Amino acid sequence: MDFVNNLDTDTSLSILSCLDDPSDIVRASAVSRSWRQFVVKYSLSKNLCLKLFHQLSNVDHIIETSNDRNGESSEAGSSSLMDTRLLEKEHRAFALLARGCMSSPIESCIADAIRASSTDNYPVESILNTLEKRDRIGRTPSYWSSTGQHKTTVPESLLYKLIGDLCLITEVSIHPFQAYFQRGHPIYSSHYVRFRLGHEKDNSPHYNNSQDKKGEPGKSSIESNYVWTYTSQEFSMAQENRLQSFQLPEPVLCIGGYLLVEFLGRVQTQEMDGQYYICVSHVKVEGRSLAKSFRVENVDDNGKFGLKVLSYNDPKKMEEMDAEAGQDMDAEAGQSQLRNLEQLLNLLHRHPLDVVDYVWPDESDDEYAESEDEAEP
């Protein structure tokens, strides 16, 4: 019995609204034409997405690329027909979005280190060092260090760009730095750590085109150029030399692709000057990236934005195909080589080479030496 045709609308909605897996919504829409019309008309895919990730309530409109929907006519039609097309478009987009959030592989989500609130010795102690898993490169320590403060309450923050406009973040891990070259081997952790997720403001400069982007300190630019749509609780950080994982209470959809790590409360002074510092050797972010499927566009002052669909291919299958082709490995290798080059430059800043100037002989000296050689028996 087709209960959609035999039951009243409210009862059918109550039954289908119990589905909490996007795959089940897709299967329901494939049962029959009447079921699909019901699922689309009452936006069941969209409602499930909003139920799972409330941040999506700010989606203002869906944008589809012409290549993906070239079968649809762009000509104007009746109001009813246009409404149906809009609902169909929303159904496709939100069904794909829900599937990606549930089935895309969990991976590292940091694309770049953007800015630190302060840096003690730039660029040797730059935020860029936190992209490296190791706490030393050869014999050279690798870490970010804040400037020193006499008060323990002065906070610090690190800003990162994620690998896509839409990332479902599940966990952030931080490795405080232990200064093995200082007496007592102090660990410069913080009391607490907190995370913010969000996007750039419309009128903010894009750091990708800025000459001072690569890790230079600038707290005011962080505060004025970004909007944070999610703020986590404060997590306690141990003063221990290990990678410490902080799992969010529930996965959070980052809209805009930026993560701010805030360090609250200083615990360790440096013996040399008696000031409090915070030092970090590595930051890692894990989650599901939807960069191959979606892009965020036209974020307004109220946080409303357009959700652009880049491809309707299954996100999980796209990742598997990329892995087989080695594209991800090549990209990761390129990033690794770039970071190694930056580490080398930092090493040269820290340990300048002693270059001995070579004095080239004058041409007259060469001629004199040749004449002496000819004169010898």
UniProtKB/Swiss-Prot annotation:
Residues 7-47 form the F-box domain. InterPro entries: At4g00755-like (IPR055336), F-box-like_dom_sf (IPR036047), F-box_dom (IPR001810). This is F-box protein At4g00755.
